[in-house]
C-alpha cells in the first residue's frame, strides 16, 4: 500500500521534465534567430532585415512588371486579330537590314494613270506630226486631222541662166500652174543675162513653154533617165516620175530629148 503514493509523486515529476509546447516553440525560434546572427555573411552585421525588405520589394516590382507586360501583350493580340485593318498593315521583320537610300529619280512620283495619259497623248501627237496633219475641231467637238502632203521639191535649170531653182510640185495641180511659176522664176534672171546695150534688158514673159511655140520649151527627166517634154503624160503620173526639170531652147529639142519626140514632130508639121 505504500507503493502507490510513490508512483503518484514520480508521475508529475516526469511530466515536468517535458517543456510546454509554447515555451519550446519560443525557445526554438530564439535559437534560430541567434544562429542567423552568428552566421558568416559578406554584408555588414545587422543588415539582414534591410536585405529581406529590399528583396521583397524587388519581387513585388517584378510581379507588377510581368503583369503589365502580359496585359499589353493580351491587348495587342486582340487588336491584331480583331482589327479591320489586319490585311492592309504589315509588321516589318526585326532581322531585316535597312538598305541605304538610293538616288531619287523622277520626284515627285507620277501616278500610273497619269503616265498612261501622257504616253497616249504623246503617241497621238507623234502620229499626227508624222502625217503632217492639221487638227481642226468640228461642230460636235471631235478632232479631225487634215493630212498635208509633204513637199516634193524638184530642181529646175534654164539654158543661158547659171543659177538653178527649186519648185514644189505638190503645191500645184496642173501644167498651166507650173508654167506660170517657171515664167515667174526665170523672167528676171533671163533679162539680167541679156545685153543691155542692145535694148534687150527688159523683162519679157516666157511663153510657149508647154506647146513649143515660144523661144523656150519645158522638159523633164524621169527616174529612168529619159528626157521628155512636159505635158505628154497625165499630171499625177508626171509628179510621181519626174526627177528634174530643164527649160531649153525650142531649136534644140530634137537633139536634147531621148524619148517622146512624137509630140514635137506633130507640132513642127
UniProtKB/Swiss-Prot annotation:
Could you identify this protein by its name?
Auxin-responsive protein IAA26
- Region of interest called Disordered, as start-end residue ranges on this chain: 25-55, 76-146
Q: What does the similarity note say?
A: Belongs to the Aux/IAA family.
Q: Record's Gene3D superfamilies?
A: Phosphatidylinositol 3-kinase Catalytic Subunit, Chain A, domain 1
Q: Which GO terms describe its molecular function?
A: DNA-binding transcription factor activity; identical protein binding
What is the role of this chain? Aux/IAA proteins are short-lived transcriptional factors that function as repressors of early auxin response genes at low auxin concentrations. Repression is thought to result from the interaction with auxin response factors (ARFs), proteins that bind to the auxin-responsive promoter element (AuxRE). Formation of heterodimers with ARF proteins may alter their ability to modulate early auxin response genes expression.
Triggers of expression? By auxin.
One Pfam entry name = AUX_IAA
Entry-linked PANTHER family: AUXIN-RESPONSIVE PROTEIN IAA17 (PTHR31734), AUXIN-RESPONSIVE PROTEIN IAA26 (PTHR31734:SF2)
Principal cellular location given in the protein's record: nucleus
Q: Which organism is it from?
A: Arabidopsis thaliana (Mouse-ear cress)
PROSITE patterns per UniProt: PB1
Q: List the disulfide bonds.
A: none
- Gene Ontology CC, one term: nucleus
Where the record annotates domain PB1, the positions are 151-250
Instruction: Give me the stretches of Polar residues compositional bias.
Output: 80-93, 117-136
